[in-house]
């Protein structure tokens, strides 16, 4: 069992060297790191191994989305890296989800571990109501679509979902049983959105029921990332302590 810490730092960099430099600076203060598609595409499994050797927990965020056989084979390779979390798109469908859950469950049982958490992506935080309709042709409202996908994730056995801060309360109030909610779109102030549409501060997200916060640019692009982390921890300390 790893000590609970809701902060996950997103290493969204186009090169391995820069990602490791940033990680080395803040490892004394945070242990959870996210490797996304951009970094994995240039550094591959090596970046995960390098971070693991530094004593970190690695969230592999590739949002797998393909035919079931391809996703399962890819997931099987990712499991050799001992990840903390792995993501796939819930839109991949019930068969893809169930086969992925089956594989990960077998891995957990064989290795006597509760990790990785298998997480389903609901609706990307860059989407809003208009882009949901225009890009996907879906008539449901954005909250309805998030809930629909989260319910499918729960029915097929996933450990949790990726959902924006705006949908946390909706999920907590409507899912049949608790599941992990991992929240991107975290900003220290609401006046800096970048390419994110549905954002919230760290404390607000935890108060609404998020379990983990994915925070990238506010930390990694700061001239003093330690100070940013310290400020975040001071804001959420009481909430974290209540969950230990």
Curated annotation (Swiss-Prot):
Disulfide bonds: none annotated. Pfam families: OMPdecase (PF00215). One of its GO terms (molecular function) is orotidine-5'-phosphate decarboxylase activity. GO terms for cellular component: cytosol. The keyword Lyase applies. InterPro entries: Aldolase_TIM, OMPdecase, OMPdecase_AS, OMPdecase_bac, OMPdeCOase_dom, RibuloseP-bd_barrel. CDD domains: OMP_decarboxylase_like. Keywords: Decarboxylase, Lyase, Pyrimidine biosynthesis. The active site is at 63 (proton donor). Substrate binds at residues 12, 34, 61-70, 125, 187, 196, 216-217. GO terms for biological process: 'de novo' pyrimidine nucleobase biosynthetic process; 'de novo' UMP biosynthetic process. Coiled coil: none annotated. It is an enzyme of class 4 (lyase). It catalyses: orotidine 5'-phosphate + H(+) = UMP + CO2. SUPFAM superfamilies: Ribulose-phoshate binding barrel. Pathway: Pyrimidine metabolism; UMP biosynthesis via de novo pathway; UMP from orotate: step 2/2. HAMAP family: OMPdecase_type1_B (MF_01200_B). NCBIfam families: PRK00230.1, pyrF. Belongs to the OMP decarboxylase family. Type 1 subfamily. Catalyzes the decarboxylation of orotidine 5'-monophosphate (OMP) to uridine 5'-monophosphate (UMP). Homodimer. This is Orotidine 5'-phosphate decarboxylase. It comes from Dictyoglomus thermophilum (strain ATCC 35947 / DSM 3960 / H-6-12).
